Amino acid sequence: MVSMKRTLLTTALAAAMGLATGTASAQFNQFYFLGDSLTDAGVYGARFTVNPGLVWAQDLGNRYGLTVTPSTQGGIDYAQGGARVTQPSPLIPAGAPQRSVSVQIDELLHATPSLNPNAVYAVWIGANDIFVNVSAAGAGLLTAAQVQANITTAATDTLAQIARLRDAGAKRIMVFNLPDIGQTPLGKSTPTAPFSALSGLFNSTLQAGLASLHVDIIPMNMFGLFNEVIASPASFGLTNVTTPACTTPSALNCTTATLVAPNAGQTYAFADGVHPTPAAHQIIADYAAAIIEAPQKIGLLGEAPMQVEQANFRAIDGRMWSGLNTPRPQNKIDAYAVYDYGNFDHSNDTGGSDNTLNSIVAGVDMKISDQMLAGVAFGYTEDKGSFGNNGGGFKLDEATLTGYVGYGSGPWYVGASAGAGDLDFHNVRRTFALGAGSRTENGDTRGTHVMGRVFGGYWFNTSGTWIHGPFARLTYQEANVYAYSETGTSSSAMTFGRQKRESLMSSIGWQASGTFGSVRPFGRVTWEKDYNDDNRSVLAGLVSMPGNFSIPVFRTDDNYVLFNVGASADLGSKLIGFISVSATAAKDDGNYQAVTVGVRMPL
């Protein structure tokens, strides 16, 4: 990009801070980028950073396996250095096309009249409008009031351009506010220029209008992130946030051979007076990824109660297995206690997340007639979840109360249970890279959990030792995770909406049990099918900036096979012990295993 004056060349192209990448899955299939030199992937043959370094859009694309090149070369990055929102820019080189964001959207819509609703569209613009107006005011061509009016108009025009994307079919639009340009090397070298005030004016006008757009806005708080980098560069792996890394006036002409120090591109924040170094662009890309991936992580909270109910069922089921072929008197209470350990190892769909459950269940039941049994059980589960890729995790403590009843007549039997749980999620943490550093955002929330099931089966007695027969179960669950905000006030602290996860699971299979003296082995294999495993989305936003968006979250496999084998044995004149092992197979999202151990005795 060229400048109106040599000293303004570097100012004309927006300022920002950048970050470092990582890996994770995201539920969208394409990106499109619109903006100025902060996002320009090489319209002029080089980029406004330490070349051949990348800009944040390219770093983000690499994270998701996308090659980001300029649209002028057939790519998905429409940004052009020097661009303004709608007006022609004197900061664009003579003879080069005048491609404001308005023109960039024209080009995008010409190539794709109906926009891909599963893509993310990134818009970062406005800094050059500030640079041009400040320069005009310095030349006596505009008054301060006119400059303020022009910047307000630029922000309003940005909202109008975002609305054009919405009207053409875009569903998720990533909107960046401006960093504090007054804190850049250029801004600090011209302290009388109103860069900070105009950055704030543009941002406040832009942010005030986001809610009226009625489209998913993925907010990117560059103002906050920029100030955090300036305040604590070491936290991001940087050593210099005040002077440029390049010896050339413009980063467009900067390479690793023209640095003030050999590694300045990785330790300085600024390549020139306003443009980020590759290290800073990496920070921006990491920040963007952390925001858009956050709903997927938090969506796993809604899955955790489903696992708790499975642990409760294994505990009560183990108690029922222990009662086979062991007659008991009517109107006598049996008490039991069970420990269950479960491990859920998810696939890469969740970045390799993992859950470890430790459950204790205690209950009593009574044979109230020759055919009927009734009981109640109290359970407590600690579920420790990991988001995978060292991306944080959570802890769920759930207390449950379950009532159950069973009826048998000859070889037939049926039963039902109903219960509820109180969800206490704490130490919910998202950990993510920000350049060479990392950050963790924390939060807590609560929720409710209800569940009910009916089941039945039939026993064939083929010998005096073994019985076997069909088994069927239908289980309904509903978990509600309350909305919450993370506790920090940083640029990356987020809010998350209420989640509702429903499941209607059928289990159909065959089971068998034998008697060999005081030992009674048992086993069951079932086909599990969830009829209510619909797509879910989690609503999210920033604590520090308006705008909310929904991202589809992890969906469990709704077809798999479940195995359960174990045995019960007489441990004394009254005490009966039991143990079982459960495991899944053919579960595309990752299998789980569990061990259940318990004792039962009459009171």
Residues covered by each model-derived region:
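Ser/Thr-centric signal marking residues that sit
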Residues: 11, 277, 445
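Conserved active-site regions of diverse hydrolases
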Residues: 3, 25-328, 341-347
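Gram-negative bacterial Sec-dependent N-terminal signal peptides
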Residues: 1-26, 405
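Short, Φ-rich (hydrophobic/aromatic) sequence segments
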Residues: 13, 17, 307-319, 527, ...
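A detector of low-complexity, intrinsically disordered, Ser/Thr/Gly/Pro/Ala-rich segments
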Residues: 5-9, 19-21, 67, 253, ...
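Membrane translocator/pore-forming domains, dominated by Gram-negative outer-membrane beta-barrels
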Residues: 332-603
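Short loop/turn positions at the edges of beta-strands in beta-sheet-rich folds
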Residues: 20-23, 311, 368, 571
